[in-house]
Amino acid sequence: MLAVLLSPVSQAATQAATQAAFDPLLEEHQSLWLQGGQAVTPPAPDSDASLAADLTIHAALDLPEIRPLLLRYSRQHPERVLHYVNRSALGLEAQYLQAPLTPQADLMISSAMGLQYRLANQGHALALEAPNLAAWPANSRWRDELYAMSFEPIVMVARRDALKRLADLDGLRNPRDVLRSHRDFWHLLETRREQLRGRIISYDPRRSGSGFTYAVSDARQSPRYWTLVRAMGQADARLVSTTGAMLEALASGEVDIAYNLVGPYAVTFARAHPELVVIVPEDYVLIQRRLAFVPQQAPHPEAGEAFLDWWLSLQGQQAVASDSQLGALHPEVRGEGSAQHMREQLGDALRPIEIGPGLLATLDRLKQASFLSRWVLEFEAPAPFAGEASQGQGQGQGQGQGQIQGQAPSATQPELNQ
């Protein structure tokens, strides 16, 4: 349940944070121009980029994950100049809403499922008719306007040397047996708190929209979630706003275990860092799906629809499976890199975040503040006295135990980053 009573302090903190919100339009973003699979010179800064390109895609999806697919599509359509812009989810929405009646992008893709659903629900998305879109599974789209493009597990990542140390402490032969589930993670925080103090990292749900969505989904899936939040705080867990920040902290040796990371980013990073291991929880796995739509005012709506139709085609989905870690959703694509392969391995443990009105609940300010108020109370709850057993869900208000990167704790509006 999202609804809990707000304390006056939490309400004041939320109002202050809203008034002092950062400007997402000033954030840095990545841009890529392609034609025929080759990089091309971008137009002059004072020109209209949406008119210089034949296909403009604005997305909250890191370039390393989508670049191979953009190159493949560009080679297949050499007549088109393709412009790809990557922003945070909040920056993506803010840029669009600054001038929603002005032609900007031909396709918008975001991991912030609630934001995408809200824009489509408010009438910003075109109804599409391309054949592969019409055949897309009903549970992976909303009407004919909003389409799921990925099937991404939310995972944990750990340092191999840390798992080895913890396994030795518990007399386990296989270090992988130390951490296989959410329950194992909670057990480690309870029994190895001193060894892990300051060595855990996760999303700050007050500063990350994705982190907030995962926190809400965790709370819906597990009655133990609030004791997990309390245990993280008592272990001085560090909180950041992106999966990338977690991965960098792991690689540098600053932390040992990261919780609730975007799976594709984690897998790609771990391939270059063999000291890390990606853990897909065995008890339940949250599944994020990036959602895409063609804006009503797209400068080249037919180009945006054509790209999305290619992505969801059998050919496109085979490319998604082979060229990325995003997860192919097409029912005929099997094997590594497909949602079907994940279903065969994990079965009922998969928990896809549903595409529907429930997403709007994560955007309601009062419900956000209520949930975050409870989250702060648990995370900042004081550690038990020596020898005292952990006692369920915390109600006390103590000094904050966790380490929040970049700001002091407060129940603020999430910044809806990736």
What do these predicted regions represent?
Residues 60, 64-67, 104, 111-116, ...:
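Extracytoplasmic ligand-binding site segments that recognize negatively charged/polar headgroups
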Residues 125-134, 145-148, 274-286, 295-297:
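Short beta-strand->loop
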Residues 157-162, 214-217, 288-300, 319-320:
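A bilobed periplasmic-binding-protein/Venus flytrap-type ligand-binding module shared by bacterial periplasmic
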Residues 295-359:
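Mature extracytoplasmic/periplasmic domains
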